[in-house]
């Protein structure tokens, strides 16, 4: 009748805790002090972010898109399980959930957008609200950066890049949520990003209890990927896709969880100890998986130098190899998180060696002079210079390897624009490593970004059609090669002096193929994101079409829909509401409205492709590029 009161479990204090970095805020100067070098250009002190009134792209580094559909096996354990068995099963599960940044074919590298910690992921539509991790700022140069919530109207704090997770083989499979990237998560943890304070963690046991808890959570979360009809995905043989871990440090912000239901767990970052274990596992596994992806049970190879050199040599011959080298360099750096400083320096040299295999040899300063800085972003600076041999002006993008949140994304800057040539894509001439900086030499487009035009001018339909036609030609080419841009907006469209339109900023692009037909990362700039990206549903090249439709609204109304609202609220509206309408709908022709309606379709399967849109009657109004020259002149006269 009277049961004995159970004794409360004893919970120890964190062990081996180290307070390595302390960051404060100077109220007098209104800036952060004591920021780590990685964050110095991201939070608080970035003059570019202060002066810019444009929203910033984001990538959410909490998830990675696995390359194959894998169901977690049901594991039945007796109470006397030993640590070894549990640890083995956990490693297997962690391996299954790791994502691949490398493309599945040699056409081009998959761009894996994880650059920083930022505002965040969305909860699946069934669970109610969108939950953003820490606010993220990404400059126009395609880098995610995090900072405080938006204070300026046009500065968007957007969710960080969500590592890619696996998409169902069928395009219509409405899987929601993402697989864990291998990190330990306590009960209730969710891979989505949140405003989340980093908690101290015990140096921790990997015994049966910890493993069983994590395994159970993985199984519970994996169940969210099943179609809503209740049918389970067919079981497939377990494989181990190549993984890459987000190495960027995440900023510490407290958060409030709102509206989690339906079995979804509130997102949570792995603790520092969890990250170290996760990174060490992936660093060990990454080498053999890159070499032999068809044999998932290959044993990890201890010699990272040899694997790095091999993968780097492959990188010089194909873009897929470049991404592979980037992964291994990233994995090595992740594994060195808890190691001495000497190992960290070695990791930097490994990454630099891998990048050196992709870029051109030599020093560009021997052929370039008269450097003049014209811009700065969160990933680096942009200068114009003169080529001594030809006398032409070129643009030089300089990116410091040590200041990148996701330095493997630098491979996209080199490989994508190098391997894909099209009249409407910015031409890259060469790339170099100068000390610890990556220099990308590309054509200089005097006309600037389309943003200057849509902000200061009003475009007529003939000019809008001219821009759209050239953009669609570039997108049709990229999509035919399996490349998704994922950050289409006016900031990514550059104009030459004669009015030619060119697509730029490929730092967030991704590769799809028959083996990996869909992506699920939360990547892009909030106001231009498609509903399926925000909802974390599998998506393909059709997301670029939605973003282009939003850019058309930009050209008509001067800004994208919901631009006066915070990014989180705008994303929620895009996810839950009908496609946005033009403010000045009464001023546009039925042809333009029909053209827009073909792009802003909530169902990706019903959305027009780039090739289909090129045949739309509205584009018959397109004229020569010279139609845009007066708009560029008008934009130059505005500050």
Curated annotation (Swiss-Prot):
The record lists the effect of residue 22 to L as:
Inhibits binding to Cdc42
Organs and tissues of expression: Expressed in adult brain and eye. High levels detected in developing photoreceptor cells and future bristle cells, and lower levels in cone and pigment cells, as detected in third instar eye imaginal disks (at protein level).
Q: How is it modified after translation?
A: Autophosphorylated when activated by Cdc42.
Under InterPro entries, the record lists:
CRIB_dom, CRIB_dom_sf, Kinase-like_dom_sf, PAK3-like, PAK_BD, Prot_kinase_dom, Protein_kinase_ATP_BS
Q: Does the keyword Disulfide bond apply?
A: no
Q: Which residues carry this modification: Phosphothreonine?
A: 525
Q: How does it sit in the membrane?
A: Peripheral membrane protein
State the SUPFAM superfamilies in the record.
Protein kinase-like (PK-like)
EC nos: 2.7.11.1
Catalytic reaction annotation: L-seryl-[protein] + ATP = O-phospho-L-seryl-[protein] + ADP + H(+); L-threonyl-[protein] + ATP = O-phospho-L-threonyl-[protein] + ADP + H(+)
Presence of keyword Cell membrane? yes
The main place the protein resides is other
Q: Which residues bind ATP?
A: 374-382, 397
Where does it localize?
Cell junction, Adherens junction; Cell membrane
Q: Name one GO cellular component term.
A: cytoplasm
Pfam families given in the database record: PBD, Pkinase
Q: Which key words are in the record? A: ATP-binding, Cell junction, Cell membrane, Developmental protein, Differentiation, Kinase, Magnesium, Membrane, Neurogenesis, Nucleotide-binding, Phosphoprotein, Serine/threonine-protein kinase, Transferase
Required cofactor names: Mg(2+)
What happens biologically when this protein's gene is inactivated, per the record? In the adult brain of mutants, the calyx, peduncle and the lobe system of the mushroom bodies are reduced, along with other neuropil structures in the central brain. The Kenyon cell body layer above and behind the calyces is thinner. Additionally these mutants have a rough eye phenotype and bristle malformations.
Q: Which residues carry this modification: Phosphoserine?
A: 521
Q: Which GO terms describe its molecular function?
A: ATP binding; protein kinase activity; protein serine kinase activity; protein serine/threonine kinase activity; small GTPase binding
Q: Specify the superkingdom.
A: Eukaryota
Q: What does this protein do?
A: Involved in neurogenesis of the adult central nervous system, and together with Cdc42, regulates photoreceptor cell morphogenesis. Phosphorylates exogenous substrates when activated by Cdc42.
Q: Which PANTHER family match?
A: PROTEIN KINASE DOMAIN-CONTAINING PROTEIN, SERINE/THREONINE-PROTEIN KINASE SAMKA-RELATED-RELATED
Similarity remark: Belongs to the protein kinase superfamily. STE Ser/Thr protein kinase family. STE20 subfamily.
Identify this protein by name: Serine/threonine-protein kinase PAK mbt
Whichever gene encodes this chain, its name is mbt
């Amino acid at each position: 009748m009277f049961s004995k009161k159970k004794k409360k479990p004893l919970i120890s204090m964190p062990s081996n805790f180290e307070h390595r970095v302390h960051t404060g805020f100077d109220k007098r100067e209104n800036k952060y002090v004591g920021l780590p070098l990685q964050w110095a250009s991201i939070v608080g002190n970035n003059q570019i972010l202060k002066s810019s009134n444009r929203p910033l792209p984001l990538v959410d580094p909490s998830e990675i898109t696995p390359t194959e559909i894998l169901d977690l096996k049901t594991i039945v354990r007796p109470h006397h399980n030993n640590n070894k068995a549990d640890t083995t099963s956990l490693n297997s599960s962690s391996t299954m959930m790791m994502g691949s940044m490398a493309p599945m074919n040699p056409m081009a590298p998959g761009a894996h957008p994880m650059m920083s910690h930022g505002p965040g992921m969305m909860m699946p539509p069934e669970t109610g609200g969108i939950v953003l991790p820490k606010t993220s700022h990404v400059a126009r140069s395609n880098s995610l950066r995090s900072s405080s919530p938006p204070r300026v109207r046009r500065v968007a704090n957007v969710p960080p890049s969500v590592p890619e997770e696996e998409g169902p083989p069928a395009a219509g499979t409405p899987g929601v949520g993402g697989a864990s990237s291998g990190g330990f998560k306590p009960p209730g943890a969710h891979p989505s990003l949140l405003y989340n304070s980093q908690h101290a963690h015990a140096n921790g046991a990997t015994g049966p209890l910890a493993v069983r808890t994590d395994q159970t959570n993985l199984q519970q979360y994996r169940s969210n990927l099943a179609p809503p009809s209740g049918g389970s995905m067919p079981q497939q043989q377990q494989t181990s896709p190549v993984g890459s871990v987000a190495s960027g440090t995440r900023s510490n912000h407290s958060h409030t969880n709102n509206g989690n239901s339906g079995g979804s767990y509130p997102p949570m970052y792995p603790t520092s100890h969890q990250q170290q274990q996760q990174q060490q596992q992936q660093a060990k596994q990454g080498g053999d998986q890159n070499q032999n992806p068809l044999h998932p049970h290959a044993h990890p190879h201890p010699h990272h130098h040899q694997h790095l050199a091999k993968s780097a040599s492959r990188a010089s011959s194909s873009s897929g190899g470049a991404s592979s080298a980037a992964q291994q360099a990233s994995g090595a750096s992740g594994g060195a998180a808890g190691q001495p400083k000497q190992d960290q320096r070695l990791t930097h040299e490994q990454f630099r060696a891998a990048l050196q295999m992709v870029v051109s040899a030599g020093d560009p300063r021997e052929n370039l002079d008269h450097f003049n800085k014209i811009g700065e972003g969160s990933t680096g600076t942009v200068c114009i210079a003169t080529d001594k041999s030809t006398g032409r002006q070129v643009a030089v993008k300089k990116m410091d390897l040590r200041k990148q949140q996701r330095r493997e994304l630098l491979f996209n800057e080199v490989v994508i624009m190098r391997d894909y040539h099209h009249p409407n894509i910015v031409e890259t001439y060469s790339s170099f490593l100068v000390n610890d900086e990556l220099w990308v030499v590309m054509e200089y487009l005097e006309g600037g970004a389309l943003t200057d035009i849509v902000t200061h001018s009003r475009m007529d339909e003939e000019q809008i059609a001219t821009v759209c036609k050239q953009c669609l030609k570039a997108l049709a080419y990229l999509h035919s090669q399996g490349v998704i841009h994922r950050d289409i907006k006016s900031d990514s469209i550059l104009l030459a002096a004669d009015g030619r339109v060119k697509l730029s900023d490929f730092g967030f692009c991704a590769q799809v193929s028959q083996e990996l037909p869909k992506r699920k990362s939360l990547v892009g700039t909030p106001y231009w994101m498609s509903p399926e990206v925000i909802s974390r549903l599998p998506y393909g090249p059709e997301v670029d079409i939605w973003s282009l439709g939003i850019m058309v609204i930009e050209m008509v109304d001067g800004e994208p829909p919901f631009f006066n609202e915070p990014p989180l609220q705008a994303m929620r509206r895009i996810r839950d509401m009908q496609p946005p309408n033009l403010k000045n709908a009464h001023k546009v022709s039925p042809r333009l409205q029909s053209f827009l309606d073909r792009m802003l379709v909530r169902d990706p399967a019903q959305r027009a492709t780039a090739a289909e849109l090129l045949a739309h009657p509205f584009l018959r109004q397109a004229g020569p590029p010279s139609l845009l020259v007066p708009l560029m002149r008008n934009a130059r006269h505005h500050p």
